[in-house]
């Protein structure tokens, strides 16, 4: 619970209305380099966008790798896309250590848009900025997915 409160406070501070950066989703910056592209966490539409990427997942679906594969896949990766959930669940540090030879992007609505992440081998961070908070709260209370949140804010990407 304390981690969740801390993470929410970090995002409230960094993901502000006035922040500037590239107005695109971080996944739009990624090219398919086959298995040299490693994705940590499953994203909607990922198979279509990066059909040859190696996907590491906590509960792997068919075609995905288990978490233990990170030690083998990440050091050899050309680019690594990490779900922002890895920050809140505490798994981000070892993933970044293993990815030091790759271009690393942290992606997801909960990604804190902080340049401080660049000090930890992150090259880009792509998150979400809430613009219409009342509508967003209503969407979340109804169990809306990220696609339902999209009209109430904007994605933004910071680059190193």
Question: Where do the model's predicted regions map?
Answer:
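Electropositive, gly/pro-rich neighborhoods at or near active sites that engage anionic ligands
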Residues: 1-44, 140-142, 157-160
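Short glycine-/acidic-enriched loop or helix-start segments at secondary-structure transitions
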Residues: 26-27, 48-49, 91-93, 116-117, ...
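Conserved acidic residues
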Residues: 35, 78, 123
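Short, conserved loop/helix-junction motifs that constitute active-site signature segments
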Residues: 50, 73-75, 96-101
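Thr-Gly-centered strand-to-loop micro-motif
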Residues: 82-83, 107
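C-terminal functional extensions of proteins
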Residues: 105-160
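Conserved mixed alpha/beta catalytic, RNA-binding, or beta-rich assembly cores of soluble enzyme
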Residues: 5-7, 11-15, 36-73, 83, ...
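Rossmann-like adenosine-cofactor binding region
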Residues: 89-95, 104
């Amino acid at each position: 619970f304390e981690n969740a409160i801390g993470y929410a406070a970090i995002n409230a501070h960094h993901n502000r209305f006035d922040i500037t950066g590239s107005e695109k989703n971080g996944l739009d910056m990624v090219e398919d380099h086959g298995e040299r592209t490693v994705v940590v966490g499953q994203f909607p539409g990922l198979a279509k966008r990066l059909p040859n990427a190696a996907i590491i997942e906590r509960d792997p679906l068919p075609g995905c790798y288990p978490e233990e594969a990170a030690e083998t896949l990440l050091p050899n990766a050309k680019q690594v896309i990490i779900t922002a959930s890895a920050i809140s669940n505490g798994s981000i540090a070892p993933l970044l250590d293993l990815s030091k030879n790759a271009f690393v992007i942290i992606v997801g609505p909960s990604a804190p848009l902080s340049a401080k992440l660049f000090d930890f081998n992150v090259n880009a961070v792509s998150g979400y900025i809430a613009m219409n908070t009342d509508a967003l709260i209503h969407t979340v209370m109804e169990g809306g997915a990220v696609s339902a949140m999209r009209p109430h804010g904007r994605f933004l990407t910071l680059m190193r």
